[in-house]
Amino acid sequence: MASDRAETQRRRRQRREQVRALSWRPLMRGSLVERLRRCGRANCACAEDPRRRHGGKFLTVQLDGRTHALHVRPEDEGKVRSAIAAYTQLWKLINELTACELSDLQREARERRRARRRRR
């Protein structure tokens, strides 16, 4: 039991340290998607052939119950991808911290039950 507690505390310290390191990076929740569209010019190849449509990257984010889309220029794509990846990593770390807290609560409940049984 003591080793379980020590292991959980070690994992918790590691995850908190990783969260601190991530907090300095840009974080963004959202998705980067590519939309293929026709440009509207009658002479363009995209008007005839759907495979030749024009592409563009868009960041989609849901805020306050509404979905927002923003065009992302090619030179900004790397920065946006990095911010999304950092947010995803942060979310995983928070889930792992939640698992540590849950493990502690479960262990404490088991210990209380055992202590009550011994008193009887």
Residues covered by each model-derived region:
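A positively charged, amphipathic N-terminal helix/segment that binds anionic biomolecules
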Residues: 1-120
